[in-house]
From Swiss-Prot:
NCBIfam families cross-referenced by the UniProt entry: NusA
Keyword Cell inner membrane carried by entry: no
Domain KH residues, every copy: 300-446
Assigned protein family: Belongs to the NusA family.
Organism listed in the record: Borreliella burgdorferi (strain ATCC 35210 / DSM 4680 / CIP 102532 / B31)
GO cellular component, one term: cytosol
Record gene name: nusA
Matches recorded under Pfam families: KH_5 (PF13184), NusA_N (PF08529), S1 (PF00575)
GO annotation (BP), single: transcription antitermination
Record protein name field: Transcription termination/antitermination protein NusA
UniProt-annotated location(s): Cytoplasm
Length: 482
């Protein structure tokens, strides 16, 4: 018996978080390797762990014979000692592991080390896979090139710099809550990737602090976050009588403040989710107060929000943060305007309608293709960059009629500045046209010649034509002699 092995196995199990059975199995396999290395075979080897102490014993199973031909497998009855175990025709002779040579022991030790590491890795992998997307508690061990290494008990995890909030700073041995983001086998063992920026981390914190979320009474529609600065959480309840926001805030804000404290003061907006998109848009832009919401394109998820002048900065947020988070929460593109800006847009809209009518009238008068080139596309004006023209074409706004009827904010989002819109509108308002052949003599000739019209469509024609440039009907001319 190898005394102390039972105690050693228990210590390894406690230190590494491994099961005693898995450690015993590994040690048994390693001893069998040493046995075979020394004796040449381990077919008759028998390994036993004491029921009381857990200590290891190694036996050689030998057949009791009157004449020994193979000392490894056979034994004389007279050579069996009282300590040996006899079962029928076989005796179990205890082997002192000290008989193994150094090489056999070294091979067994290396095998044990590798196997124990493999078992430990598999158990850690299994444990943390079951904790994926869950919050665990650890202690900061070190900061290496911006990455935080966290002691999780039986292993270490790492919070890459990109998964850390810029607001948070940690010192050695600080207690920290983290989300188990990913677990995988790496070159140096199991890698446990942690995060404090993932939306799931916020969801887990909310569930820990708010029983109604944990119990499913209140549900989370979506979470968006600009780590270190602001979080927006849309919540709802399937029971109409339940206010989804109040329980999340808590009495005197105690629940939400607990989470804000955990995030080192990061702002959190709890927003009631609504299927009424206008209401949802209004609430998503909290803390600002919204006057009106206009749906510009329901299919493309585009909307215009109007706020008072003093609410614009709140609605947009610092560096556009508030409206950007709202866009992500809604999956809509929101354009925010002040009341005064919106009034100006309305005036411009009426102006565009007048311009459109005037433009149509002018173009109706321009019918002679030999003299004039009709402008039907904004791209013909050569006033916008190709990329902007491409954007307009995709939305159908390269067509002048569509352009004039388009909302000013929509055009702005496609890359046409308000100044450029004004310039284009002015050109069209003044009825400018491009003269293809502005030769004075040809113009005078048109005025002097008798005007001929196509009998089918009314387009101006002349005797040199064989077909109408308008309707393409075939032409022939007969002139009476004077």
């Amino acid at each position: 018996m190898i005394k102390g092995t039972g105690h050693m196995i228990v210590n390894i199990a406690n230190d590494r978080g491994m099961s005693i059975d898995s450690i015993r199995k590994t040690i048994k396999e390693s001893v069998l390797i040493a046995y075979k290395k020394y004796f040449g075979s381990n077919e008759n080897a028998f390994i036993k762990f004491d029921d009381d102490t857990g200590d290891l014993s190694v036996y050689a199973k030998k057949k009791i014979v009157k004449e020994v031909k193979d000392s490894l497998l056979e034994i004389l009855e007279k050579d069996i000692s009282k300590e040996n175990i006899v079962e029928g025709d076989y005796a179990y002779i205890e082997i002192n592991p000290k008989v193994f040579d150094r090489l056999s022991i070294q091979v067994a030790k290396q095998r044990t080390k590798n196997d124990l590491q493999g078992i430990e890795d598999n158990e850690i992998l299994s444990e943390f896979k079951s904790k994926l997307n869950k919050v665990v508690i650890g202690y900061v061990q070190q900061n290496r090139n911006g990455d935080l290494y966290v002691n999780l008990g039986n292993t270490d995890g790492i919070i890459p710099k990109k998964y850390q909030s810029p607001r948070e700073v940690y010192n050695l041995n600080d207690k920290i809550r983290v989300l188990v983001y990913n677990v995988k086998k790496g070159k140096n063992g199991i890698e446990v990737i942690l995060s404090r920026t993932h939306p799931k981390f916020i969801e887990e914190l909310l569930a820990l602090e708010i029983p109604e979320i944990e119990e499913g009474i209140i549900k989370i529609h979506k979470i968006v976050r600009d780590p270190g600065y602001r979080i927006k959480v849309a919540v709802y309840s399937e029971k109409e009588e339940i206010d989804p926001v109040g329980p999340c805030i808590g009495q005197k804000g105690v629940r939400i403040q607990s989470i804000i404290k955990e995030l080192e003061g990061e702002k959190i907006d709890i927003i009631p989710y609504s299927k009424d998109i206008k209401e949802f848009i209004k609430d998503s832009l909290t803390p600002s107060k919204i006057e009106h919401v206009y749906i510009l394109d329901e299919d493309l998820h585009k909307a215009l929000v109007v706020v008072s002048d003093d609410q614009l900065s709140l609605a947009i947020g610092k560096m556009g943060q508030n409206v950007r988070l709202a866009n992500r929460l809604l999956d809509w593109a929101i354009d925010v305007k002040t009341s005064s800006q919106f009034a100006e847009m309305k005036a411009n809209s009426e102006f565009k309608q007048e311009t459109l009518e005037m433009f149509d009238k002018v173009m109706q008068d321009v019918v002679e293709e030999e003299q004039f080139e009709e402008i039907s596309k904004i791209s013909d004006l050569k006033l916008l960059d190709p990329s902007v023209i491409s954007n307009l074409s995709k939305e159908g706004f390269d067509d002048i009629n569509n352009f004039l009827q388009a909302d000013e904010g929509v055009l702005f989002n496609l890359g046409v500045s308000y100044e450029k819109q004004e310039e284009i509108n002015k050109i069209l308002k003044e009825g400018m046209i491009i003269i293809a052949n502005d030769n004075d003599e040809s113009m005078e000739k048109v005025e002097e010649d008798e005007e001929l019209l196509c009998p089918e469509c009314g387009v101006v024609i002349n005797e040199n034509m064989t077909s109408c440039p308008g309707c393409k009907i075939g032409l022939s001319f007969e002139f009476e002699e004077e």
